[in-house]
């Protein structure tokens, strides 16, 4: 591919779409297919079962960046992956968002995300909304006159029959613009509505934050943005504030409330961490991330994390550290057990440190897939 083709993303996406439609003429299901390694995908608990749905993402091999548009279902009981494809479905993307609804036999709603040339010299941000019918195994593109601007790195949460979207960023290649607008999509009426906010009482512009739904509203934590100061080098900021979006079916009554930091919050601050909802405990579970510190004026040092934190959602919110425990020894009268023998230390079985991974809690089990760990 020459340089002109490399920069013409519209032509590249049109080529991908034509090749995909030619190859996938009908809805297909494939078994025994494991997703390739990737980051910035979505891992979504099925709203009507025990399964998990993995969609999209990207992989950078050091020279080229590849984007995916495949949809996978993970079945925990069988430890099995299945992939689903159809002629009509969203284009390749990463840093999109997906939420689930139990309506209509189960639905997966996807908005936005990004696609880039293989050398990452040019970027395309999506502003399309798609819904996947789990029962029918089909995608539908939802067309609306009013909709959020194109973006990636935003977050969405499902509250009752509303999809709530906040923030994200747009990267032109020369500069990254971070967003702080709030939108609500009504899945009954198929309409987007922007919620106007008080600039002094809302979260600052950001991407890559956590956004968890509760019966009363939505909790926002952390995220990342860049600080531009004239004459100085751009500075990346890992945010550590928490907010609560008080929801109401009367959308004019929605408002933000800032929360104080209580308990054992992640320290030091980090970006690229992921928080999943543990509904049975009314808690968010946060994993991993990366902390960047300046080694000197020319270089940065990155520390990657694989620790777990819990954020208790009710009330004003409280952080707790989730330490791994050693498994209990099994008692068996017919076995001679050496009391001096140590059970396996759980620290030796922790996932590798990483950021931008995909995590989800389903039936009291935490699942972690993919992410990025840098060396050298």
Give the positions of each predicted feature.
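Beta-strand-rich domains and repeat architectures in extracellular enzymes and scaffolds
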Residues: 29-67, 94-97, 353
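Beta-propeller blade signature
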Residues: 67-80, 124-138, 177-191, 232-252, ...
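Sequence/structural signature of beta-propeller modules
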Residues: 1-29, 33
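Catalytic lobes of large eukaryotic enzymes
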Residues: 193, 212, 239-262, 274-287, ...
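Short loop/turn motifs that recur once per blade in beta-propeller domains
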Residues: 26-39, 85-94, 143-151, 196-206, ...
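Glycine-centered tight turns/hairpins at beta-strand boundaries that repeat
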Residues: 47-64, 86, 102-122, 142-144, ...
């Amino acid at each position: 591919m020459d340089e002109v083709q490399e920069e013409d993303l519209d032509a590249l996406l049109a080529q991908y779409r034509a090749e995909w439609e030619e190859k996938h003429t009908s809805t297909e299901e494939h078994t025994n297919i494991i997703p390739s390694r990737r980051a910035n995908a979505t891992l979504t608990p099925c709203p009507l079962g025990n399964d998990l749905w993995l969609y999209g993402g990207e992989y950078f091999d050091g020279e080229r960046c590849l984007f995916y548009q495949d949809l996978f279902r993970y079945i925990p009981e069988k430890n099995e992956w299945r992939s689903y494809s159809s002629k009509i479905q969203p284009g390749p993307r990463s840093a999109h968002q997906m939420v689930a609804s139990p309506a209509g036999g189960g639905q997966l709603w996807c908005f936005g995300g990004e696609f880039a040339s293989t050398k990452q010299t040019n970027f395309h941000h999506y502003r399309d909304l798609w819904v996947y019918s789990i029962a029918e195994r089909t995608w539908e593109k939802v067309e609306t006159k009013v909709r959020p601007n194109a973006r990636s790195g935003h977050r969405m949460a499902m509250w009752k029959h509303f999809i709530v979207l906040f923030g994200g960023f747009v990267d032109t290649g020369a500069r990254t613009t971070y967003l702080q607008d709030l939108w609500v999509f009504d899945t009954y009426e198929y309409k987007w509505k922007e919620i106007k906010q008080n600039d002094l009482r809302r979260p600052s512009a950001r991407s890559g934050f956590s956004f968890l739904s509760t019966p009363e509203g939505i909790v926002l934590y952390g995220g990342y943005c860049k600080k531009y100061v004239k004459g100085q080098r751009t500075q990346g900021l890992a945010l550590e504030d928490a907010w609560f979006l008080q929801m109401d079916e009367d959308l004019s009554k929605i408002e933000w409330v800032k929360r104080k930091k209580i308990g054992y919050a992640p320290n030091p601050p980090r970006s690229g961490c992921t928080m999943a909802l543990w509904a049975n405990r009314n808690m968010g579970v946060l994993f991993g991330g990366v902390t960047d510190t300046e080694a000197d004026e020319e270089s940065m040092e990155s520390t990657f994390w694989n620790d777990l934190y819990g954020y208790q959602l009710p009330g004003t919110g409280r952080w707790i550290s989730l330490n791994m425990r050693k498994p209990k020894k099994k008692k068996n009268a017919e076995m001679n057990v050496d009391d001096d023998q140590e059970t396996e230390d759980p620290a030796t079985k922790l996932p590798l440190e990483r950021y931008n991974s995909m995590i989800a809690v389903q039936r009291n089990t935490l699942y972690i897939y993919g992410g990025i760990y840098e060396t050298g």
